A protein has these predicted regions:
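Loop/turn elements at helix/coil->beta-strand transitions in domains of secreted/extracellular proteins
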Residues: 56-62, 127-132, 159-166, 191-195, ...
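N-terminal carbohydrate-binding/catalytic regions of secreted carbohydrate-active enzymes
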Residues: 44-148, 320, 324-365
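C-terminal outer-membrane/trafficking sorting elements
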Residues: 591-658
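Aromatic-lined glycan-binding groove of carbohydrate-active enzymes
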Residues: 48-67, 72-73, 203-317, 327
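Short, well-ordered beta-strand segments enriched in hydrophobic/aromatic residues
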Residues: 406, 455-465, 536-542
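N-terminal module-boundary/linker segments of secreted carbohydrate-active enzymes
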Residues: 24-70, 194-196, 203-204, 212-220, ...
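Acidic/polar low-complexity flexible segments
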Residues: 394-405, 478-506, 533, 542-592
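Aromatic-rich peripheral "rim/lid" segments of glycoside hydrolase catalytic domains that contact
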Residues: 156, 332-408
């Protein structure tokens, strides 16, 4: 018995030593962020596009994830570049050599690059992904690269950030590979339990369907096992690829049929000529580069996601994030139909099984290629929200004037708080980031707020540490505020009508207006601002940014992004932006005067409440406010200076807004 307790204590102590400490959870509410994608499509939110009334917490979304880059040869051969140079006779690499299908937005990278792993995880958590399933289908397990992903999970856990759970997808040599993975990561390693995606009370492992019964007994006992391969649907099967319309996959383990999983992909294979534009049972015509007129739009992805949203399975497995590479093979007379898209089928022609170009690949990760960019990532975000649901965009509670000569405690009771993750400036990458951004340190933005009164807008921003002092070299990229005042993403620069930024010649902030004719920012009025330690606030007249009315608007803070950038993909990994990527926060300014809102109940907390109509002295109705029936405190309403008449039932009262 003493030995038993000694062993138990050892296990518990070991677990406590190695288990990362969980910080208080930080929730940036990324499902409330808004934007349009590069094609002008609205990313779904509760303001537009999401019809599910509440978030379904039982939904789990997994992403097929790869760490194999650079592990089978470091030379970069890019099919897209080769086709651009000569689409008829490209300068291929050797037979069996891995080729990239295009260039990622963060550049060609090596599996296990900490900067890349961290930014992938941030992007996927923002998208609502719950777990990764690693590709180990060819029996290579990439242990060192998997460890880097685990390290990033631990880092996020220490910061209190959401992180993905993990599972493995096997195929070739499933028996041998599953035993290796079990002994490497699972056996007698309770300190690793927080990594795993659990299904039916055990870690999930996917493998060859028949190998589930022939693999080692320790594997069978430790895992919930599901068969997984392309197009294999049915009982105890979780495929990673299926034809539209995809079916539910189910289990009968308990003697009762339980519907479990469905897959969604962005395309199939170059050899089958089913690409990203395939829908309605056909692939559009491809040109000599193997591209279609609608490669950028994700028709296959949308068709499959609509089926998943309709059927609403408990687990949705997405194919895929970042395969990027495929081996070069050559046809013979027996398989010349496999010839690459856009080329004449013949023996001796090159083909690639899984990845070819922008049209024929299954990746979602943002790309530097002109037809892809971040279109598929934004399509992912939008459809995950439609599938699971999204939270309401938070609304402000009260109007408030901020005195810039006062202290920062004025902001303590201002809501909502717009959160940005801490720690997203921890790593740098000379291959992924612009050189000018790397030369400077970046402020790690974590909190933003907005306040308003009748005439002015006030903005607050906070970083994790003291704000790094601006210099001449980064004056125009230092702690800059972007405003989309009309929420119209078809005008301005990427929708932004105003930029509030320092000038390059002095310690002053100005309002810059986007000039559609010159495609440049025009300097305008100087505004007031103040910073102290890790906080900063600024103010401007509503009229200076076309926000005289009480309306909603979108905004974003950026720091140390490339100077004079006209490339919004720079926001993926250069400097810090809040919120991430091309997303924006939405300030629901209209809610402060909505008749249905309780936002104005701060007027007199002791009185009874009713809807009070407010008129100017010309008889024009200005607003309907919820306030006390005693009509006290009317001067606190969000109105321009002047005299007004408030009416409630047969009561009326003149009051002055100072």
């Amino acid at each position: 018995m003493k030995k038993y307790f000694a062993l138990l204590n050892t296990i518990v102590l070991t677990f406590m030593i190695h288990m990362p400490l969980q910080a208080q959870e930080i929730d940036p509410m990324s499902d409330t962020w808004v934007c349009n994608d590069g094609l002008g499509r609205v990313v779904a939110s509760m303001d537009r596009g999401v019809t599910r009334k509440q978030v379904d917490e039982n939904c789990q979304v997994g992403m097929f994830y790869y760490v194999w880059h650079g592990q089978h040869g470091a030379e970069v051969k890019d099919i897209t570049r080769l086709l651009e140079a000569d689409p008829v006779n490209p300068a291929w690499g050797s037979v069996n050599q891995f080729h990239w299908g295009g260039k990622p937005a963060m550049g060609y990278y090596t599996g296990g690059d900490r900067f890349i792993v961290a930014h992938h995880m941030q992007q996927l958590m923002d998208a609502g992904i719950d777990f990764y399933f690693f590709d180990v289908t060819n029996a290579f397990t990439y242990d060192a690269q998997v460890q880097v992903v685990m390290d990033e999970i631990d880092r996020r856990m220490r910061l209190g950030l959401k992180y993905p759970k993990l599972a493995f997808l096997l195929h070739s040599s499933s028996e041998k590979t599953s035993l290796h993975l079990y002994e490497k990561w699972y056996k007698n390693k309770p300190e690793n339990d927080h990594y795993w995606f659990y299904w039916n009370g055990k870690p999930l492992m996917m493998m060859d369907y028949d190998a589930r019964k022939t693999c080692d007994a320790a594997v069978r006992n430790h895992f919930t096992l599901r068969g997984s391969w392309a197009w294999e649907e049915g009982e105890d099967k979780w495929p990673w690829l299926a034809y539209y319309p995809q079916n539910y996959n189910f289990s009968n383990e308990t003697g009762k049929k339980v519907y479990e999983q469905m897959t969604v992909a962005t395309a199939m294979h170059p050899v089958s000529k089913i690409g990203k534009s395939y829908s309605g049972g056909s692939e559009p015509a491809v040109n000599k580069y193997g591209l279609t007129a609608r490669t950028s739009r994700g028709a296959f992805f949308e068709e499959q996601f609509k089926q998943a949203i309709k059927m609403h399975p408990r687990v949705l497995m997405l194919t895929q994030w970042n395969e990027w590479m495929a081996q070069r093979f050559v046809t013979d007379e027996s398989n010349k139909a496999l010839t690459r898209p856009g080329a004449t089928p013949k023996a001796g022609e090159t083909y690639f099984v899984d990845v070819y170009n922008q049209e024929f690949n299954r990746d979602i990760e943002p790309s530097s290629e002109s037809l892809i960019r971040d279109n598929y990532y934004m399509q992912l975000v939008s459809n995950v929200r439609k599938y699971r649901g999204a939270r309401e965009i938070p609304v402000p509670e009260a109007c408030k004037s901020i005195d810039l000569s006062g202290d920062f405690a004025q902001w303590d009771d201002v809501t909502p708080s717009f959160i940005d993750e801490p720690g997203d400036c921890e790593y740098t990458s000379s291959t992924a980031q612009k050189a000018e951004s790397l030369k400077r340190r970046t402020n790690d933005i974590v909190l933003c707020k907005v306040a308003k009164d009748a005439d002015s807008l006030y903005f607050y921003v906070q970083s994790t540490k003291h704000l790094i002092a601006p210099s001449i070299s980064n004056a125009e990229t230092w702690m800059t505020l972007l405003l989309n005042s009309d929420m119209n993403y078809s005008n301005g620069w990427e929708g932004y009508d105003y930029m509030i930024s320092r000038s390059g010649t002095g310690d002053h902030y100005y309002i810059y207006t986007w000039n559609g004719e010159t495609q440049k920012w025009d300097e305008g009025k100087e505004i007031s601002w103040i910073k102290y330690a890790n906080q900063m606030m600024l103010s401007m007249a509503k009229s200076d940014v076309a926000l005289e009315s009480d309306v909603d608007f979108d905004f974003k803070w950026i720091d140390n992004t490339p100077k004079n950038t006209t490339e919004i993909l720079d926001f993926l990994c250069n400097g810090d932006v809040a919120p991430n990527a091309r997303f924006n926060y939405r300030y629901k300014g209209s809610k402060l005067v909505s008749p249905e809102s309780d936002a104005l109940q701060h007027v007199d907390a002791s009185g009874k409440r009713a809807r009070v109509e407010v008129y100017n002295l010309s008889g024009v109705k200005m607003m309907t406010a919820v306030c006390s029936t005693s009509l006290k405190g009317l001067g606190q309403l969000c109105l321009p200076q002047g005299t007004y008449l408030a009416k409630f039932g047969n009561k009326s009262k003149k009051f002055t807004k100072k």
